[in-house]
């Protein structure tokens, strides 16, 4: 078995995991997951994510950011405001040295969330400020772009963002290729098994631009069923099927891509990398060895 998989985008602070997170993470370890990139959506989650990163040190890796849709109550999701960002920034500054990336950030032009030009423009301003923050901290961006693929990629390029992961991209492959040309990565969730759009996307994306994610508890292989990080192998297997290559190649290359995207991840696991270079055709490590370092 290879060095291990990296779940590049998941929501471990979600209430769905309140009662059994230990079990969920143990299942992930047994599924050869070596690292979980935990993203935030609003300031109210930040402390919880940092606590999880301490409790599962070297396994749960924290990202803090302000999402374009603020679901502070399930009944009233709304478009983000600059005030939301102002609340979040001091907490991000507090933890800046411990962050793997800034995220989840981005644009969401779904009409029910951003029905006016003013709301879309405020989303852009919130994203621009977080791009500037990520550049100052020299960390990547973990990006949401629902119903806003082209505007998101255009803004990121205009702002000079270089380290970017576009998670669960829902746009056309031709638009995604603009991101590929900018050096951006695209993470693919297990829901690819039921998404013709994701399958077309993967068919066109070069493997060198693909990472794996689960977006747990969302975007699982079955609709309306809680997704978990252990399902990441489902995404890897389906990508292999779509591209007509071995699942071993998908696992190896997507993990290597994750290390390129997240430099701090490479630093964290430097000893493992020295023992089992990701560039090698066949990694010699085992799941047990990976766990021992985490």
From Swiss-Prot:
Keywords: Hydrolase, Metal-binding, Nuclease, Nucleus, Zinc
Cofactor notes: Binds 2 Zn(2+) per subunit. Exhibits AP endonuclease and 3'-exonuclease activities in the presence of Mg(2+) and Mn(2+). In contrast, in the presence of Ca(2+), shows AP endonuclease activity exclusively.
Protein name in the entry: Putative deoxyribonuclease TATDN3
Highest taxon listed in the record's lineage: Eukaryota
Binding site for Zn(2+) 1: 9, 11, 104, 215
Enzyme type, top EC level: hydrolase
UniProt record similarity statement: Belongs to the metallo-dependent hydrolases superfamily. TatD-type hydrolase family.
């Amino acid at each position: 078995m290879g060095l291990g998989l990296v779940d590049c985008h998941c929501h471990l602070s979600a209430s769905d995991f309140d009662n059994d997170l230990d079990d969920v993470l143990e299942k992930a370890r047994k599924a050869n997951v070596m690292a979980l990139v935990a993203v935030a959506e609003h300031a109210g989650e930040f402390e919880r994510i940092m606590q999880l990163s301490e409790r599962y040190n070297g396994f749960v890796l924290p990202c803090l950011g302000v999402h374009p849709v603020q679901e502070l109550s399930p009944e009233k999701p709304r478009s983000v405001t600059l005030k939301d960002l102002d609340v979040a920034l001091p907490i991000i500054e507090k933890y800046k040295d411990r962050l793997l990336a800034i995220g989840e950030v981005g644009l969401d032009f779904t009409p029910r969330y951003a029905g006016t030009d003013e709301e879309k423009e405020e989303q852009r301003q919130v994203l621009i400020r977080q791009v500037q923050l990520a550049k100052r901290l020299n960390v990547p961006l973990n990006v949401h772009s629902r119903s806003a693929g082209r505007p998101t990629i255009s803004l990121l390029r205009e702002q000079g963002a270089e380290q970017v992961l576009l998670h669960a991209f829902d746009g056309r492959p031709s638009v995604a290729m603009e991101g590929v040309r900018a050096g951006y990565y695209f993470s693919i969730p297990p829901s690819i098994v039921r998404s013709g759009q994701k399958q077309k996307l993967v068919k066109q994306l070069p493997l060198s631009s693909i990472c794996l994610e689960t977006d747990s508890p969302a975007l699982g292989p079955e609709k309306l069923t809680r997704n978990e990080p252990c399902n990441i192998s489902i995404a890897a297997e389906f990508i292999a099927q779509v591209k007509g290559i071995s699942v071993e190649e998908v696992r190896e290359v997507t993990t290597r891509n994750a290390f390129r995207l997240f430099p701090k991840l490479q630093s964290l696991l430097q000893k493992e990398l020295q023992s089992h270079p990701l560039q090698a055709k066949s990694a010699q490590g085992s799941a047990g060895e990976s766990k021992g370092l985490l």
